[in-house]
Amino acid sequence: TAPAIAAAALQSLKDSDGSMLLVLSADHVIQDVDAFHEAINIASQQVQSGKLATFGIVPTNANTGYGYIKSSKENSNGAHKVEEFVEKPDLKTAQTYLEQGNYLWNSGMFMFKADVLIDELTTHSSDIVNSVNNAINNATQDLDFIRLDKQAFESSPSDSIDYALMEKSDNVVVVPL
């Protein structure tokens, strides 16, 4: 997901300096739309101040099928500093996370300003930014579509945004859902 998100951010910067990106997974069901809108508003405030935001789902059980986000217990207007991303745990560890109360399921949904994302991604995974930037600079326009340069885009490391950036940055907050 990192190259695709980087492409969206770089392209949006061509159109507007202050672009914000909201990256949503297609496999989520949002049951409480009002709470989701409130979470987006909270994240937006954090993002405007230069943070990278992710959304964590408050766990309802000790689940071994999800990665977790350990958050600070301090609350900054509804957001918490991310202390650690953790891989899918065994059942005993998941139960401990549930009991501690400051672990959230990793939703894979994010919000950031395009320029902040690119700055952070350049710091932590510059090879992705360089390849994707080359793909955009050599893109072609096809009706309403932008066709990235295939060879340049394929030269980018295939990495998730979690591994390429979110787990490496100390500038990440999580908003509970």
Language model features with spans:
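Conserved beta-loop-beta/alpha segment of the NTase-like Rossmann-fold superfamily
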Residues: 1-74, 123-124
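Catalytic core of tubulin tyrosine ligase-like
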Residues: 68-177
